[in-house]
């Protein structure tokens, strides 16, 4: 049994956009709409978590001498 590859941010966003389009059409049966909504919420959380992770990575930047220093937008 192969382990499922974790979805990338871009893949999750594409699926989320597809779900939103289906729900916006308005002709989705209630049960399907609920399932789409639940899947959309999972994808939304996945995207949020990935963005949070990247944000934490960007809090520090590497100086030329290799030292990690807190990132300050004013210095950029």
Curated annotation (Swiss-Prot):
A single GO cellular-component term on record: exodeoxyribonuclease VII complex
Xref: Gene3D superfamilies: Exonuclease VII, small subunit (1.10.287.1040)
Location of the protein in the cell: Cytoplasm
A GO BP entry: DNA catabolic process
Keywords assigned: Cytoplasm, Exonuclease, Hydrolase, Nuclease
A molecular function (GO) term: exodeoxyribonuclease VII activity
Main location: cytoplasm
Catalytic activity reported: Exonucleolytic cleavage in either 5'- to 3'- or 3'- to 5'-direction to yield nucleoside 5'-phosphates
E.C. numbers: 3.1.11.6
EC category name: hydrolase
Function text: Bidirectionally degrades single-stranded DNA into large acid-insoluble oligonucleotides, which are then degraded further into small acid-soluble oligonucleotides.
Listed NCBIfam families: PRK00977.1-2, PRK14063.1, xseB
Subunit: Heterooligomer composed of large and small subunits.
Family: Belongs to the XseB family.
PANTHER family reported in the protein's UniProt record: EXODEOXYRIBONUCLEASE 7 SMALL SUBUNIT
Protein's recorded name: Exodeoxyribonuclease 7 small subunit
Gene: xseB
């Amino acid at each position: 049994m192969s382990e499922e590859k974790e979805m990338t941010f871009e893949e999750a966003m594409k699926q989320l956009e597809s779900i939103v389009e289906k729900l916006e059409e308005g002709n989705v049966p209630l049960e399907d709409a609920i399932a789409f909504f639940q899947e959309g919420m999972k994808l939304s959380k996945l995207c949020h978590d990935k963005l949070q992770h990247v944000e934490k990575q960007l809090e520090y930047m590497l100086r030329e001498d290799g030292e990690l220093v807190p990132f300050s937008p004013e210095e950029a």
